[in-house]
Amino acid sequence: MAFWQPSQRLYLPPTPVTKVLCSEQYIRRKDVFYHGETERMLTVGHPYYEIKQSGSGKTIPKVSPNQYRVFRILLPDPNQFALPDKAMYDPSKERLVWAVVGVQVSRGQPLGGSVSGHSYQNTLIDAENVSKKVNAQGTDDRKQGGMDVKQQQILLLGCTPAIGEYWTTARPCVTDRPETGSCPPIELKNKPIEDGDMMDIGFGAANFKELNATKSDLPLDIAKDICLYPDYLKMTEEAAGNSMFFFARKEQVYVRHIWSRGGTDKEMPPEAYFLKPKGGDQTQKMPSILFGVPSGSLVSTDGQLFNRPYWLFRAQGMNNGICWLNQLFVTVGDNTRGTTLTITVPTSGSPLTEYDTSKFNVFQRHVEEYKLAFVFQLCSVTLSPETVSHLQGLMPSILEHWDINMQPPTSSILEDTYRYLESPATKCADNVTPMGPEDPYAGLKFWEVNLKERLSLDLDQFPLGRRFLAQQGLGCSTRKRVAPVPKVTEKRIVRKRRKGN
């Protein structure tokens, strides 16, 4: 049978995709589990901005309920660990690594809404209530505004920092030549989420250092900051799967008010969209820029993501919970405990009999309370050529941490080697300090938690450990049944007397 085919079309096979091995293909899990937990971790600061005291030179940090808390968990090197069984692995052919199988992030303090605002907010009119007509703007129409911000709970777990996304100004093309005062182009950028970075609270994920020129468009806690939103799309598509083993989130928001911005609107609606007023000025005076005031609404214990365990059986990426470089990153965002403490102090030491506002100093503080607990499983990696080659392409710092060097290429340059370097007749040796392993996150800010001396094999002595044992069908203690002792019955021997005796 003959078929007709167009001769001008040629379909090539698709380009093969570079395959990344799942960690379970070269990881051997041991039946050894360790429990590690932190102490109660507390932080206190101002909820909106950092304060530098002029007299003492000390700084009151910014501790906002709308900030991320990123914990960098430092684990001991299992290859230098005192293991219960020395025959567990062969150091010449294997390396030991940690795998996280359970995590619980516990939070203290009562629930409370997160309140923010600005004393001079760029709010022209209340656009949802049309009871009053405003014909013109003044020089300064700013007002005091407050709100309960978007409600968020975020929990991210990985062995590298989580990645956030935000919008910021971009460089215009050379041929555009934008005018002064025109709207700049914007672009989407990424950065690692650090401890203290701001979450999106209902006004978008953007660099407000560049986009908020009035310093009045946003609440005080984000007016000069970058609001980040976790880039779930990028972390999900990451080949290695290191930045996000799993995540849990809850977002809740509704528009409580609709206000308009003050300023000169350079992008007015076209004339075809409205009829001009009869008589008077034919130009539209009021701007058409509206924005919604967010509200996080009810805060309750029904939808809490914290104070409960999470068990990792299968990660969303190719890394199934392996803690490369003996570290773990826990990214937490939670503003459901956003209560701000108001502290009033009298200005004088004499007792007061009448209320006078001028005789009191008012301060604000926000407090946070955390406690982390983990269950780790001991694993081994066989140093086969395939595994070493895969790890070299995936994360070369792993092999450097294990003191495994790849064979360097043969140099074609003739180098000089001097003898008697300490002799006055020979040139001075190069003062080169041997470089140690560099910290790839040296310039980033994290809340470091050292668990190198806080691991224990006694899982039944800790709440998370007992829950893990219950998941495995084991209890905190086992009682051996006593086998019943069989009763020994003595047989009575009855002798018959012979007749005649």
Curated annotation (Swiss-Prot):
One Pfam family, short name: Late_protein_L1
Record has Thylakoid as a keyword: no
Keyword Disulfide bond carried by entry: yes
UniProt record, GO biological process: endocytosis involved in viral entry into host cell; virion attachment to host cell
GO cellular component annotations of the record: host cell nucleus; T=7 icosahedral viral capsid
Protein localization: Virion; Host nucleus
Alphabetical list of InterPro entries matching this protein: Capsid_L1_Papillomavir (IPR002210), Capsid_L1_sf_Papillomavir (IPR036973), dsDNA_vir_gr_I_capsid (IPR011222)
Main localization, broad class: virion
Single GO molecular function: structural molecule activity
UniProt-listed HAMAP family: PPV_L1 (MF_04002)
Main function: Forms an icosahedral capsid with a T=7 symmetry and a 50 nm diameter. The capsid is composed of 72 pentamers linked to each other by disulfide bonds and associated with L2 proteins. Binds to heparan sulfate proteoglycans on cell surface of basal layer keratinocytes to provide initial virion attachment. This binding mediates a conformational change in the virus capsid that facilitates efficient infection. The virion enters the host cell via endocytosis. During virus trafficking, L1 protein dissociates from the viral DNA and the genomic DNA is released to the host nucleus.
Family: Belongs to the papillomaviridae L1 protein family.
Listed name of the protein: Major capsid protein L1
